[in-house]
Amino acid sequence: MTTETLACTYAALMLSDAGLPTSAENIAAAVKAAGVSVRPTMPIIFARFLEKKSVEALMAAAATQAPTATSAAAAPAAGEASGKAEEKKKEEPEEEGDDDMGFGLFD
């Protein structure tokens, strides 16, 4: 993501949070106040996109589609538990196999 895109995104989020309209003029003013220079078309593109969908609707959609931390953490934990059980099963036959090899280094 470019600096221009991030600046316009943060400006739109800030304007929405403040309850101000996300017009091209407001986005351009917020970006200019932040000291970031963007192409003149960037605020227009963002404003036209946000005419069709509000920032709140986009944030709500992102929140419902994002995986939760608990489900993401639970899946690897379950995989690790079964993986550890499999490792223990695999280790036991190897230990028995070492005794039967008959190397006898310390006998």
UniProtKB/Swiss-Prot annotation:
Residues in coiled coil: none
Positions of region (Disordered): 67-107
Biased amino acid composition, Low complexity: 67-82
Tagged with keyword Cytoplasm: no
Annotated keywords: Ribonucleoprotein, Ribosomal protein
Gene Ontology annotations for the cellular component aspect, listed alphabetically: cytosolic large ribosomal subunit
Protein family membership: Belongs to the eukaryotic ribosomal protein P1/P2 family.
Skewed-composition ranges (Basic and acidic residues): 83-92
UniProt GO MF annotations: protein kinase activator activity; ribonucleoprotein complex binding; structural constituent of ribosome
Summary of the function given for this chain in its UniProt record: Plays an important role in the elongation step of protein synthesis.
InterPro entries: P1/P2_N_sf, Ribosomal_P1/P2
Subunit structure: P1 and P2 exist as dimers at the large ribosomal subunit.
Source species of the chain: Leishmania peruviana
Name of the protein this chain belongs to: Large ribosomal subunit protein P1
GO biological process, one term: cytoplasmic translation
